[in-house]
Amino acid sequence: MRKYFCFLLIALLSQSLLMAQTVPSPKSHFGFNIGDNYQLATFTQTEAYLKKLAAVSKKVKLQVIGKTEEGRNQYMAIVSDPSNLANLEKYKTISQKLAHAENISVAEATQMANEGKAVVWIDGGLHATEVVGIHQWIESIYQFTTRNDEETKRILANTIILFVHANPDGQELVSNWY
């Protein structure tokens, strides 16, 4: 009986740990699918979702890049292959050197271009009443975080995507008003 109880306990704990590591879908977090009629995510909900994604996915790194006028955190969710996220400083240095292009030879620039990664900036929510922007942003982060098809793997292996929330105050204001 004791062996059975121990086995059952280990099985339940293992399942709990696996479930805890699962990336939550927007529907499971917000209570609706992104794009559902008459449903808007607040910034407070979005912030909590970003934190969950960063906690459970090795493909997401969350950074606070400043404060808004109303004192909210402004986030950048960096999405890429985990090996790229582990070497962010290296790729940042390469990008900065190539952007400034000072005192580097053509050979050095070519080598850095071959070694570096494409950096893509995607922001959402700039104009608060244009609510599709921030919601597609949330869905895009989710899709890049959870999809495991060859095309997504290729994109994440070669690209560092900077998802920046452009207007947290506006999202909170409009979604609460709505």
Q: Which ranges hold each PLM region?
A:
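Bacterial N-terminal signal peptides
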Residues: C6-S16
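Positively charged n-region of N-terminal signal peptides that target proteins for export
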Residues: M1-Y4
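Boundary at the C-terminal end of the N-terminal hydrophobic targeting segment
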Residues: L18-T22
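Acidic/histidine-rich, surface-exposed loop or edge segments in extracytoplasmic proteins
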Residues: V23-Y38, W121-G124
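A non-catalytic alpha/beta surface segment that caps or lines the substrate-entry region
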Residues: F43-E89
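Surface-exposed loop and adjacent secondary-structure segments within mature catalytic domains
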Residues: G66, Y75-D81, Y91-K97, A107-K117, ...
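Divalent metal-coordination and catalytic microenvironments
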Residues: T42, G71, G125, L162
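Sec-exported extracytoplasmic/periplasmic mature domains
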Residues: K51, A55-K58, I141-E150
